[in-house]
């Protein structure tokens, strides 16, 4: 008789943060946190941009876990959203962990989305979606997401696992950037796929970064985040 795997408690985290302009300062406009998702707001000088730090108190993600973050920048707001530490995706029993992030940036706002890297451990599986909506061409964005395949300094390798990373960026409702990266052991050992020139050419970390800002800033003017 084959025993079925027990049903385990899964981690659920949801966070929402919003920033607005008050005079010449950026202040908090909205804050919600539930489950394993927590937000911290570091102390800063009055004229400094806003900042929110995301914390996953579960210590990492595995199959069936779901982490959801929404961030909003009102008109003229300037703020950075980052994480306290690298996210960790641990060995799965078969399913995928899910990470869903949504950013909404109003006109003349400056949004920096700069989480630390996501570390995929051997056997880890996750799907991540980042949806970004900029109100118009006057909105500013700097966003970066990165994935590390095993901790090289610890001698770790990734022989099995699955990654699906999906970006969708819209400006005034128009799709301006769409990207999807998938790596799965259904095709080959992930480490061997990363060795291929068209994939990572032997690298064990990848990153996607995007900057959207009015063209005048590339002509020498100071950008909204300094």
Residue ranges and their predicted role:
Residues 147-226:
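A structural signal for small-residue-enriched, beta-sheet-centric alpha/beta enzyme cores
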Residues 1-117, 122:
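N-terminal, charged/glycine-rich beta-strand/loop interface patches
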Residues 18, 53, 70-72, 102-104, ...:
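Residue-level recognition of well-ordered beta-strand positions that form the cores
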Residues 95-159:
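Internal, conserved structured core segments that host functional sites
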Residues 77, 139, 165:
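Short beta-strand/loop motifs in extracellular/secreted proteins, especially
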Residues 18-22, 74, 106, 133-135, ...:
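Solvent-exposed residues in well-ordered beta-strands and their adjoining turns
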Residues 15, 67-69, 99-101, 109, ...:
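One face of beta-strands
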